[in-house]
Amino acid sequence: MLSVEELSCVRDERVLFDNLSFTISSGELIQIEGHNGAGKTTLLRIIAGLGRADSGQVCWKSEGIESAREDYYQDLLFLGHQTGVKRELTAYENLAFFQAMHNESIDQDMSGKPPVLGDESLWQALAQVGLAGREDVLAGQLSAGQQRRVALARLWISNHKLWILDEPLTAIDKQGVKVLESLFLSHVERGGIVLLTTHQDMFADSNHLRKIKLGQ
C-alpha cells in the first residue's frame, strides 16, 4: 500500500538516513523511532510529499506519489507540528471548515458506507479531545495545547485512509492518550494506516504496534 524505496536524505552535510526501505500494509500502525535529530520529522514530511529526499522514492498503491499526487492527497491526512488551526475561527468552525474542504474525499468511509457527519459529529469530536464547553471560543484565544486538540479532533471526522501524525500526543494527558490509542486501533481495524512519531510509550500490547528505528 505505502512503500519507501531506498530513500536517502542529507541535511547540513549530515546523513539522516541512507537507502531506507520499508513497506506498510493496510491495517498497520507504525511508529518511527529515533533520537532527536535522527530525521523523524523529515521522513514524515517526505512521505507526506512536503519535503524532498536526495534519492529514492515514496509509492502509494505501487505508484510514485509525485505522479499519483491527486489520489494520494485524497487518501492522506497529515498533522505536523504546525496545527493548521485558523485563529480567527472558533474551535467548532475550524472543524466545520475542515469537513467542508474535504467533503469530496469523505463521501464514503473505507467500508463503502456513508460516514455519519454533520453538526453532532463535530461537537462529539471536540468532546473527545476534551474541548467540551470550548467549542465557540476563538482558536486564537485557546492555549497552544488546546489548539493542538482542535487539530486532533479532525481525526474523528476523517475518512482518509492514511494518517501521518508528527508527535500527536504532545501536551495530551494520560486519559487523552488512551482515547487516541483507541481511535488509532479503530482506524487500522477498518483497514486504515497510522504512521506516527511520539516520545510517549504506547500500547502495553506491542502486537498492536510496529516500530521503525532511525539512526541505528
From Swiss-Prot:
Keywords, ordered alphabetically: ATP-binding, Cell inner membrane, Cell membrane, Cytochrome c-type biogenesis, Membrane, Nucleotide-binding, Translocase, Transport
Q: Which domain of life is it from?
A: Bacteria
| Recorded catalytic activity of this chain's protein | heme b(in) + ATP + H2O = heme b(out) + ADP + phosphate + H(+)
Q: What is this protein called?
A: Cytochrome c biogenesis ATP-binding export protein CcmA
- Protein EC: 7.6.2.5
Q: What is the lineage of its organism?
A: Bacteria, Pseudomonadati, Pseudomonadota, Gammaproteobacteria, Vibrionales
Residues noted as binding ATP in the record, renumbered to the chain: G34, H35, N36, G37, A38, G39, K40, T41
- Which Gene Ontology CC terms are recorded? plasma membrane
In terms of PANTHER family, this protein maps to: ABC TRANSPORTER I FAMILY MEMBER 1
Q: Is tRNA-binding one of the keywords UniProt gives this record? A: no
**What SMART domains does UniProt report for this protein, alphabetically?**
AAA
For membrane topology, the record states:
Peripheral membrane protein
User: Would you identify the family this protein belongs to, as annotated?
Assistant: Belongs to the ABC transporter superfamily. CcmA exporter (TC 3.A.1.107) family.
Q: Where in the cell is it found?
A: Cell inner membrane
Oligomeric state and interaction partners are given as: The complex is composed of two ATP-binding proteins (CcmA) and two transmembrane proteins (CcmB).
Source species, please?
Answer: Photobacterium profundum (strain SS9)
Disulphides: none
Q: What GO terms describe the biological role, i.e. biological process, of this protein?
A: cytochrome complex assembly
Q: Which gene encodes it?
A: ccmA
